[in-house]
Amino acid sequence: MTSVTLRNVCKSYGDVKISKNVDLDINSGEFVVFVGPSGCGKSTLLRCIAGLEDITSGDLYMGDKRMNDVEPSKRGVGMVFQSYALYPHLNLFDNMSFGLKLAKADKNEIKKRVDHAADILQLGHLLERQPKALSGGQRQRVAIGRTLVSQPDVFLLDEPLSNLDAALRVQMRIEIAKLHKKLGCTMIYVTHDQVEAMTMAEKIVVLDGGYVSQVGAPLELYHYPKNRFVAGFIGSPKMNFVSVFIEEVEKSQVKVQFKNGASFWIPVDGSNVKRGERMSLGIRPEHLVPAENGDAVIDGDILVVEKLGYETQIYLTIEDGDADMIYRVPDTALVKAGERFSVGIPAHRCHLFHNDGKACQRLYKEAGV
């Protein structure tokens, strides 16, 4: 196990900057997830840590040692790629031991390591089979096992579940989380799927356009996003945004007004808010309430109703919304597309964003954060 530290790390291809001034502290034994939309630089950053890409500027440390000029094979990292890259003509044992054999490791040590990894990954009974005889989930476990036998200080996983179907993704999420708990090693995991990030990570790094947008525990990012990008990216369905007028401002609360005239106080830091300006109010679909229970009410026309059994997702078109508003109702709601519908907004669950995207600090204390 070892810590990973990045100081002002930049990566460019010619004049195109991919990773921009990245500062990160990853503790020894921590499970960290890099998440963000396609093209945000998360895989590039992972490859820089692995040594597969040169760092243009800045410093990378593992423990106390600067690693910028250290060869990938000597960094003590193991990488699991999106593609399994298994040798089709070799059985599982030979696939998992291939790197050790190239390194001319002792035969007894090779068998010991492969058997141990196979036991952890529940592959012991499959070691004589070839990859074509395995399911997608089993192949991914073999790819992880091939990295595991090298006994790296840091595991790097680059979207390892993206080739699996939905059911297998859930299963493998659990398997990887169990593996981390059992090994206690440092893991850095890349995904574009914020559900994977929320369910697996101890710490999430949200990347946007090459910059680190926010770093924190999953619930911290969910309840207290520092900007509108993080607020909209973390959570599924994503946060609703509504344009509001600032009516009054106090130190620990701000009074906002909708276009329909409804106004109410939101418990946020008002130190940088100006009376009379327009801002963006955010509210998560699952935090909306029946109209009679809200501090304010918004009316809209139902566009689509998605009945999932355990919940109903109601898509509304409203005058004030930056997009369609989504309301998640527990259980089944007996409503139809085309109907007029009202939803309640609880003040304590609201977020408030400046025009540059920065969030006002929420003052309501959420459970678990």
UniProtKB/Swiss-Prot annotation:
<comment type="similarity">
    <text>Belongs to the ABC transporter superfamily. Maltooligosaccharide importer (TC 3.A.1.1.1) family.</text>
</comment>
<dbReference type="InterPro" id="IPR027417">
    <property type="entry name" value="P-loop_NTPase"/>
</dbReference>
<dbReference type="InterPro" id="IPR003439">
    <property type="entry name" value="ABC_transporter-like_ATP-bd"/>
</dbReference>
<keyword id="KW-1278">Translocase</keyword>
<keyword id="KW-0067">ATP-binding</keyword>
<dbReference type="InterPro" id="IPR013611">
    <property type="entry name" value="Transp-assoc_OB_typ2"/>
</dbReference>
<dbReference type="InterPro" id="IPR017871">
    <property type="entry name" value="ABC_transporter-like_CS"/>
</dbReference>
<dbReference type="GO" id="GO:0005524">
    <property type="term" value="F:ATP binding"/>
</dbReference>
<dbReference type="InterPro" id="IPR003593">
    <property type="entry name" value="AAA+_ATPase"/>
</dbReference>
<dbReference type="GO" id="GO:0055052">
    <property type="term" value="C:ATP-binding cassette (ABC) transporter complex, substrate-binding subunit-containing"/>
</dbReference>
<keyword id="KW-0762">Sugar transport</keyword>
<dbReference type="Pfam" id="PF08402">
    <property type="entry name" value="TOBE_2"/>
</dbReference>
<feature type="binding site">
    <location>
        <begin position="36"/>
        <end position="43"/>
    </location>
    <ligand>
        <name>ATP</name>
    </ligand>
</feature>
<dbReference type="InterPro" id="IPR008995">
    <property type="entry name" value="Mo/tungstate-bd_C_term_dom"/>
</dbReference>
<protein>
    <recommendedName>
        <fullName>Maltose/maltodextrin import ATP-binding protein MalK</fullName>
        <ecNumber>7.5.2.1</ecNumber>
    </recommendedName>
</protein>
<dbReference type="GO" id="GO:0015423">
    <property type="term" value="F:ABC-type maltose transporter activity"/>
</dbReference>
<dbReference type="InterPro" id="IPR015855">
    <property type="entry name" value="ABC_transpr_MalK-like"/>
</dbReference>
<keyword id="KW-1003">Cell membrane</keyword>
<keyword id="KW-0813">Transport</keyword>
<comment type="subunit">
    <text>The complex is composed of two ATP-binding proteins (MalK), two transmembrane proteins (MalG and MalK) and a solute-binding protein (MalE).</text>
</comment>
<keyword id="KW-0472">Membrane</keyword>
<dbReference type="GO" id="GO:1990060">
    <property type="term" value="C:maltose transport complex"/>
</dbReference>
<comment type="function">
    <text>Part of the ABC transporter complex MalEFGK involved in maltose/maltodextrin import. Responsible for energy coupling to the transport system.</text>
</comment>
<dbReference type="InterPro" id="IPR012340">
    <property type="entry name" value="NA-bd_OB-fold"/>
</dbReference>
<dbReference type="InterPro" id="IPR047641">
    <property type="entry name" value="ABC_transpr_MalK/UgpC-like"/>
</dbReference>
<dbReference type="Pfam" id="PF00005">
    <property type="entry name" value="ABC_tran"/>
</dbReference>
<feature type="domain" description="ABC transporter">
    <location>
        <begin position="4"/>
        <end position="234"/>
    </location>
</feature>
<dbReference type="GO" id="GO:0016887">
    <property type="term" value="F:ATP hydrolysis activity"/>
</dbReference>
<keyword id="KW-0547">Nucleotide-binding</keyword>
<keyword id="KW-0997">Cell inner membrane</keyword>
